[in-house]
Design a protein with these regions (language model features):
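Beta-strand-rich, non-transmembrane domain signature
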Residues: 23-249
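Hydrophobic h-region of N-terminal signal peptides that target proteins for export
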Residues: 13-22
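Bacterial N-terminal signal peptides that target proteins for export
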Residues: 1-11
Length: 249
């Protein structure tokens, strides 16, 4: 299961042909050089301080690198602490999908650890890759793959840490790029980070909603790197009869 986000940030970009070198951290199955896992695990909370939550995000992270011709790399990492039994099943079962025609998917890692960093499970107990079948009601076939993963050792108090990278080898519409990101997830978030690395010559069309922290922009050579980073976010509780366009959700 990938924990759902609620959108607060939308990015849109139309790029022109060109090439550049990425400046974002290079994340591989060997790890993320910009994040120390032990420091993230130490952010584990006391469940008694979160009586209304079944889980909390210790880290919600995205690193996106786009090129002028529409190629892109998207790496997402989630580190989630289990607080209640009701969250165990969802965090023990995960599925990831991609289009093999123009995408390459990598499960960088998926593991279960304790708050002290000791490993409970270093990888999937079971995993299966298959085609996505066409729906019986409206049988429209799409060439997509799905990877289903089952984890062992997911119990209350454990931490599930996984990272995926999807590389778009060619764009259906050259130069098109769109991404949304939600800082608010519906759960408490200890650390949230989004990095977008794009050609410096391109004008990013950015729409931000209800952010109480500034983004950081740096330039290195012919690249621009935009970072949204914050932390200590408490759960946003829904309000009965509230409007769906209240700039919070």
């Amino acid at each position: 299961m990938t924990m759902a986000r609620r959108s607060r940030l939308i990015l849109g970009l139309l790029l022109l042909p060109g090439a550049a070198v990425a400046q974002a951290p290079r994340i591989t199955p060997a790890g993320d050089p910009s994040v120390q896992s032990d420091s993230i695990y130490r952010l584990a909370v006391d469940p008694r301080d979160h009586p209304d939550e079944s889980a909390v995000f210790l880290l919600d992270d995205g690193v996106i690198v786009v090129e002028a011709d529409g190629r892109e790399s998207r790496t997402f990492r989630q580190v989630v602490q289990v607080l209640k039994q009701s969250a165990v099943e969802g965090l023990a079962e995960h599925s990831f999908s991609w289009s093999p025609d123009n995408e390459r998917f990598t499960l960088n890692w998926i593991r279960v650890v304790r708050p002290d960093g000791s490993v409970v499970s270093a990888g999937p107990a079971q995993q299966q890759e298959s085609d996505v079948p066409a729906a019986m009601g409206a049988p429209v076939y799409a060439n997509r793959k799905v990877l289903r993963v089952s984890l062992g050792g997911v119990v209350v108090g454990a931490i599930v840490d996984f990272s995926t990278t999807t590389v778009k080898t060619r764009a259906w519409v050259p130069g098109d790029f769109y991404q949304w990101w939600g800082v608010s997830t519906g759960l408490s978030v200890q650390r949230s980070r989004l990095i977008v690395d794009a050609p410096a010559t391109e004008s990013l069309r950015i729409k931000e909603r209800n952010l109480n922290f500034p983004r950081q922009t740096t330039r290195a050579g012919d690249r621009q790197v935009l970072t949204w980073a914050t932390g200590g976010l408490t759960q946003v509780k829904p309000e009965a009869y509230s409007a769906d366009s209240n700039d919070v959700h």
